[in-house]
Amino acid sequence: MKFSEMSYTRPDIDALLGQCKALAAKAAGAASGEELVNVYYEQSRAFADYSTAAQLASIHYTCDTRDAYWKAEQDFFDANGPAVENARVEISRAFLANAHVDALTEAFGTTCVAGMKNAVLGMDDRTVELQKEYNALVSQYQQVYGGALVEFDGKQLTIPQLGPYKENLDPAVRRAAYEAEAAYFDAHRDELDGLYTKIVKNLNAQAQILGYHDYSELSYVRMNRIGYGPAEIRKFRVQVASDVVPELKKVIELRCKRTGISHLTFSDLPVAFQDGNPSPIEGYEARMAAARTMYHELSPETAEFIDFMQDNELFDVESRPGKMSGGYMTSLPTYKAPFIFANWNNTSADVDVLTHECGHAFEGYVAERDPKVPADLECPGMESAEIHSMAMEFLTAPWHHLLFGKDTEKYALLHAEDSFLFLAYGCIVDEFQHRMYQNPDLTPDERNAVWLELEHKYRPWIDFDNLPFYGRGAGWQRQLHIYECPFYYIDYCLSTMAALQFFLLSLKDHKDAWERYLKLVRRAGLASYTELMQTAGLKVPFEDGSIKAIAQQMGQWIAEHQV
């Protein structure tokens, strides 16, 4: 069914909550392992219509945050979602209390029971009002960001539409584009500072109700991190600082040599080539035709997937006023349909987001069609889900010429560099958030000082050159995740470690790399991050020294492929 034909009905929350009580009773009373497994399948199906309605409302709202009808529907889910989530937790509690709970591990692997334990530890009726308040704060942030329009070059532009100007070869144009963006955020400075103060206090209050010191602890439970915790993430960040940052300095030196920029300032960062960055082919239809060819030639599975996506209008990727910034993939369970949202701005990032979100959507498409996989185990934890997307960016490389033509080699180099450089930025975001929730009384200026301190630690090559907004350390406020889904960022770093390994494997044997990827995808949400890495024969980046060799190989490839 085409997206435009999908009907929306606001769900009956009371009826759903009643159904949840009945399912909890069934889970508690299951008299055998087989019966318990069947109840698990039943409860996972029970939420399909609710989830579909919630996602339809979210899609329509983020596609136009000014639409009063969809704003009201989004408000409805913001207000009622916590009660539904807590009802689901009660079902999990009933499963865990059943004497036959081990049957779920036998049927569905290690993540099922561990995930339910995290759900029980992370939610409680006592936090419902705080959860509602948090959802409302996120919606306020989305309105501030989604409503951003700046006057530039004689036009009214959204934040994503400033992208091409930030890559302009004239440094004055680049800086002016950043200043135009900065002016918008500075105009909303008090609002953004106030929202973040409220978010930190809200989430810390939820954590303390549940017995945690602060939200940085609770986040590991809420993010359903299985098999690792804060100690492993600290080890990872230490390795990035000691083993990756020195290689990244060399990458930056090569880029400066290539571009002829002797002193790198923040507004110079987007420029990767003296004659301009790689540009993808223009036009929605041309790009979609190239994507169809690419995925048809990659594999039979991806051919079926891209036909389904395009034939059913499951892309909204062009930027326009009122549309929320960023990109995402979500699923509409009733229709077994992934949906891709993005903001193209005629830069190479358009191809990044296309292949990235198609990686997510491909995994969702495959999992939704596997009858053995319950709906709530179709997707693994976020650090694992991002492997699907980030690895897909690299595994489609043999077809990038369809999207870049003469700029293909430039894009290959830029993409490898940016993926590698991202590890430093991702660690800044993660360490910053740990510091914020562990020190909730910091003033806005003190928060910004922490951000600048971490920039110097992980990206010492950057000079902010007195740039408004960014120069005072407030650049983190345009990073959606910090407000919308705290601590969902180190996931990108962990998955980048997998994606870089897939890239290096594909250079030796693309067929082997793709088969490993497909094997990983087919495990859906039935395995943890470490198990999925092992499934594909990849190194897990928590062990001391596990990152160094990968960093050196990436540095070497980049040095050998200067354009």
Sequence positions of predicted segments:
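Glycine- and acidic
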Residues: 122-123, 181-188, 228-234, 269-280, ...
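Long, well-ordered alpha-helical segments
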Residues: 196-213, 251-255, 359-369, 390-407
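A well-structured
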Residues: 1-278, 290
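C-terminal, non-catalytic "cap/extension" segments appended to globular domains
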Residues: 110, 115-117, 227, 318, ...
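Auxiliary, metal-adjacent structural segments of Zn-dependent hydrolase domains
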Residues: 274-334, 347-348
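Post-HExxH zinc-binding segment in Zn-dependent metallohydrolases
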Residues: 242-243, 367-368, 379-407, 416, ...
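Active-site recognition of the HExxH zinc-binding catalytic motif
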Residues: 342-368, 389, 394, 432, ...
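Inter-helical turn/loop segments and adjacent helix faces that build the functional surface
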Residues: 230-231, 254, 258, 298-301, ...
